[in-house]
Amino acid sequence: MDFKGDFAMRGGRCFPLTVSDNYSRKLLCCHGLANTAYAGVWPQFERLFAENGMPWSILSDNGTPFATRSLGGLSRLSKQFIDLGIRVERTNPGHPEQNGRHERMHRSLKAWLAGVDSVREELSTLRMRLDAFMKEYNEERMHEGLGGAVPSALYRPSPRAYTGRIVPYEYDSQAIIRSVRQSGEIKWRGRMVHASALLAGERIALLPYGDGVWEVRYRFHPLGFLNDRTGRIEPLTQWREIARPETPRCKQRV
């Protein structure tokens, strides 16, 4: 998932939200939004999950609204994914090639829009153009990497039905559980330690890592390491590589 940049339109700017299936390359969403705020983005994912089921993981870059610089890279959107049992993965900064298939689709979209004078068009008209691109890309354009097939012929929805219900998470029996206060802090060893205000009211787990260091997780998502000596949670620098939910492996990723 990503935004294909943004461009001027009549009365504002258009931000095309794109979501594709990693296996079949089917473009599941190519929808123009007026901004990148959670309020407009989440309904698109809710629609996608209702129509196609939920994936096991989602890959994005580190931009808004997919990630932030807070602990674990959590944003309101990525927390929503984690609450639904979806693993969030991110490319390393400055390495769009790590999501190469999606980036190649973006180049095709850019070429498709090259002759459009977007400044003269309303958002509704631009959305129709994006819908037309998605239809051609999925159903008419043969892909060499797919052996000449079209993405729609290979795509299969996820068997994970979306209900909108957040299932309580059971932590490992060895984990020490702490509740995050409204300030974003937890109480640990007699002192307050800042975690994340985004997790206020949630339970996080601390797992022994060794020599006074504890791995901190929200559900299956790693947040960082708490050091008893410093009393601080240090964020992970390569956290996406160890973020593995306790779910079966599956091809389904968007």
Predicted regions and their residues:
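RNase H-like DDE/DDD metal-dependent nuclease/strand-transfer catalytic core used by mobile genetic elements
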Residues: 3-18, 22-131, 136, 230
